[in-house]
From Swiss-Prot:
NCBIfam families: mraY. The lineage of its organism: Bacteria, Bacillati, Bacillota, Clostridia, Eubacteriales. The gene is mraY. Its EC number is 2.7.8.13. It is found in: Cell membrane. It comes from Clostridium tetani (strain Massachusetts / E88). The chain crosses the membrane at residues 5-25, 50-70, 77-97, 113-133, 148-168, 173-193, 195-215, 224-244, 247-267, 298-318. This is Phospho-N-acetylmuramoyl-pentapeptide-transferase.
Amino acid sequence: MNSKIIYSVLVAFFISIITGPILIPLLHKLKFGQNIREEGPKSHQKKAGTPTMGGIIFILATIISMFILIKNPSDEAMFAMYAFIAFGVIGFIDDYLKIARKNNLGLKAKQKMVLLLIVSFAFAYYGANNPEIGTSIIIPFSEKTLDFGIFYIPFIILYFAATTNAVNLTDGLDGLATSITILVMTFFVIVSFNMGHYTLSVFCAVTAGALLGFLKYNAFPAQIFMGDTGSLALGGAVAAVAMILKLPLVVIIVGGIYVLETLSVIIQVISFKLTGKRVFKMSPLHHHFELCGWHETKVVSVFSIVTVILCMIAFLSFK
């Protein structure tokens, strides 16, 4: 693999490491602390006041690294970075409103979904009308592609909305979403490089490197949370990269933890509405394992191991 990929990881890592000690005290000073849901695990109540919006750290590290390393980024790399930033902005607005209102209620669900759908439409429309991306996607474990035609735009809109929300739901334990997304982005570094998308592989590498640096401050016990600023940005980046590579279906495999977290919430809600009973002790899934007696670090470790296995399976899907 090109040595530039290694440099990309290292540059972003060190920028993220340097940014942390600057931003964390600033957020403390501004009293940008996380409000913890009362209905969440009792062990999480002590986390109240931990600075949020930490996604700013790895977003800045990624942007700065890209402009340091690549003088003329390709359209596809810029597309991924625009998605990264655009969804991050929605998350930032949500985080800011939560802090301003001093509760865990930021944007209303409908407001947030409308913003996500509008931004998703913009990227879906661009992709459908870009000959380098087109309206077809690769079917895993086969040499075939599926052309969505006129259904491509609605499919991609739902795909972006689902991916961003899934990463957002996964961000419930110290270092969980960070660790999982480092592995997912590492997978896409290798795949995009092997498919000839070199500048896109650099984007994936700097994102992974920036997250590695951020993990120093986000791992248990977290000094800062990424907030919706970070989780929505990461969801947008993962969705955009996979869309460019025509691999939205592969995200279901490598992002299996994202999928399970989301399904656990859906199953919990449907079960409670239909039967009045809960399938899980608490959703999303990571909280269920917490209430089963698992420590946060064990949940993160096991989910990360599962993601490594899923990435290996995803590699086998390429013929």
